[in-house]
Amino acid sequence: PALGGTCTNVGCIPSKALLQSSEHFDQANHHFADHGIEMKGVSMDLAKMIARKDTVVKQNNDGILYLLKKNKVSFFHGRAAFSKAVEGGYEVTVTGTANEVLVGKNIIVATGSNARALPGTPFDEINVLSNDGALKVGTVPKKLVLIGSGVIGLEMGSVWRRLGSEVTILEGLPTFLGAVDEQIAKEAKKAFDKQGLKIELGDKVGEIQ
């Protein structure tokens, strides 16, 4: 666990780092020639891409810690549990690198989120991946199916499509990006179609075998 929650560690920050790397690769392979820039023998080092992504995440973690210190906010690394009610509020025990007992009158519980597996599709992080596993893939998969057209799924679909995967996105709703403006969703789908993502709407996922 690290500062920043899902977005910083296993969400939009690392996915956008990989988006940038994959975009550079795609530009070098398919678009630089249009500008008179000829490149031969363009290769990809996925391990370096992943390492750069991890560096970007670490820089964000460090930046958050700096802001906490700058604003005199104490940070304790560990797992917290309410112990009892005491005069002045509640006692919280923190178990971690150093055990601490804290007391607060007002306490905000912000535990973050975990990926939710669908019935019949448990994560094994080998064949069925959560967002965390999808950000750590060591080789470019030949084929990749993404369940749901959420933000992270679409970003990771773009990444792996640019790097050579055949990507299919299964969306249970009958419309693409149903929660956003209809015209924006229409233009976004055009862009993803142009990238080569295959988007199937109204598909429900059963058991994966």
Feature locations, PLM:
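Rossmann-like NAD(P)H-binding beta-loop-alpha module
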Residues: G138-T175, A179-V180
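Alpha-helical macromolecular-interaction surfaces
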Residues: E155, R162, K186-E187, K194
